[in-house]
């Protein structure tokens, strides 16, 4: 793993959105059959748990971790021309490709969750291309997050195998989130994993209110939801919420100095 590649990617993302800020409005888009809810954050930050909670609502379909947004955005980033800049047609292309894929899922629900954690890189595209979307960013204690990533060795995430790489990537992530918050104030719903585990009902109420969903008791019984979960967190989200998981790393503190 070489972090230089990710540094260049994150720099390119900031370059695109620093050049000219464009956001689609209602006059630019056709009415969509579905409204996306994007759940993002670092892996092991609680995205699967929130997916399972909201996905237990009777009006919501939990689609899991979809790679489509990344597939549609990355070619644009690679071919970005600073002279031409960033235009509405670029956003419309990403929007239409993504919504066509969501339509192809053929689900009855009008609200669809996409919980690809690393889509935090594309929050700018979410806000700009999907003005109707809801964006939930999961926060968790940094050491708890990084220890959990390191413990489970995420396939495909090269930074997870080395503590120094992991720490450096985490700093890239935090820097980009600060950029998004400054660029799009009040557009991202920040949820803290520790708050959710300490007061599930209150935080679930806040979540549903943000998503413009009425209360559904099923969201408190998310562990009974039979929807398949295909992540490392699959077993955990089939159980009731438990407290204290963010402190487990402390038992290994002496071995986690690079973090």
Identify the role of each PLM range.
Residues 1-36, 82-110, 149-190, 198-259:
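PAPS-dependent sulfotransferases, especially Golgi type II membrane carbohydrate sulfotransferases
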Residues 65, 192-193:
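A secondary-structure boundary/capping signal
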Residues 67-69, 140-145, 196-198:
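Conserved nucleotide-binding/hydrolysis micro-motifs of P-loop NTPases
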Residues 126-130, 136-160:
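Conserved P-loop NTPase nucleotide-binding/switch module
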Residues 15, 49-50, 144:
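Short hydrophobic/aromatic residue motifs in ordered secondary structure
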């Amino acid at each position: 793993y070489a972090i230089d590649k990710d540094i260049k990617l994150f720099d390119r993302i900031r370059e695109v959105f620093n050049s000219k800020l464009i956001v689609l409005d209602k006059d630019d888009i056709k009415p969509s059959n579905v409204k996306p809810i994007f759940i993002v954050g670092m892996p092991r930050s609680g995205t699967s748990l929130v997916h399972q909670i909201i996905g237990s609502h009777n009006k919501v379909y939990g689609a899991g971790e979809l790679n489509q947004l990344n597939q549609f955005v990355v070619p644009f980033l690679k071919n970005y021309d600073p002279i031409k800049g960033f235009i509405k047609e670029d956003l419309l292309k990403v929007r239409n490709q993504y919504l066509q894929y969501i339509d192809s899922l053929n689900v009855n629900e009008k609200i669809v969750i996409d919980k690809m954690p690393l889509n935090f890189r594309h929050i700018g595209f979410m806000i700009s291309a999907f003005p109707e979307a809801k964006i939930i960013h999961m926060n968790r204690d940094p050491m708890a997050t990084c220890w959990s990533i390191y413990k489970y060795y995420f396939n495909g995430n090269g930074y997870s195998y080395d503590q120094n790489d992991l720490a450096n990537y985490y700093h890239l992530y935090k820097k980009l989130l600060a950029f998004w918050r400054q660029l799009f104030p009040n557009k991202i719903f920040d949820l803290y994993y520790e708050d959710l585990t300490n007061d599930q009902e209150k935080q679930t109420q806040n979540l549903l209110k943000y998503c413009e969903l009425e209360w559904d008791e099923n969201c408190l019984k998310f562990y009974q939801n039979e929807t398949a979960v295909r992540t490392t967190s699959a077993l955990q989200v089939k159980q009731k919420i438990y407290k204290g998981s963010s402190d487990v790393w402390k038992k290994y503190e002496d071995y986690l100095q690079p973090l």
